[in-house]
A protein has these predicted regions:
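ABC family nucleotide-binding domain
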Residues: 1-118
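Conserved beta-strand-loop-alpha-helix hinge in the C-terminal portion
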Residues: 122-140
């Protein structure tokens, strides 16, 4: 997750936010991924899923126009994965951020407004979903 190992979770988020003109507060970013209470822990003290959430908080703190998420729920349990997907969906809608989510979990595609399926490096399907579902409506 490319965390700096001698910096706390909070410091990792703050480090990324330093390059932005209007970053999200590091504590707000960590709270949004459910890790405010772990802000002063170092990466080695965090589980793989917690490290993944710190990296998501770090990305969100920069308030990007485009957020690339490669398997953002890969190291997360079901409930935490749902929380992160809900956060990404809400951030996308509220902040008008484009979120590109790469996943092997086809069951979550109904939440997307644009779905591109690939096989062997080639696009096999390109669909615009006029009625994306809220994460709460999806089961997998």
């Amino acid at each position: 997750y490319n965390l700096v190992h001698n910096l706390t979770a909070k410091e990792n988020v703050e480090l990324a936010a330093q390059i932005c003109s209007n970053p999200l507060d590091s504590e707000t970013a960590l709270d949004s991924v459910g890790l405010l209470e772990r802000a002063n822990n170092f990466p080695a003290q965090l589980s793989g899923g917690e490290q993944q959430r710190v990296s998501i908080a770090r990305a969100l703190a920069k308030r990007p126009k485009l957020l690339l998420c490669d398997e953002p729920t890969g190291a997360l349990d079901y409930n935490t994965g749902r929380q992160i997907l809900k956060l990404l969906q809400e951030t996308c809608r509220k902040d008008k951020m484009t979120v590109v989510l790469i996943t092997h979990n086809g069951a979550i595609t109904p939440m997307a407004d644009h779905i591109i399926r690939m096989k062997s490096g080639k696009i096999v399907e390109d669909i615009y979903n006029e009625n994306p579902k809220n994460v709460e409506e999806i089961e997998w």
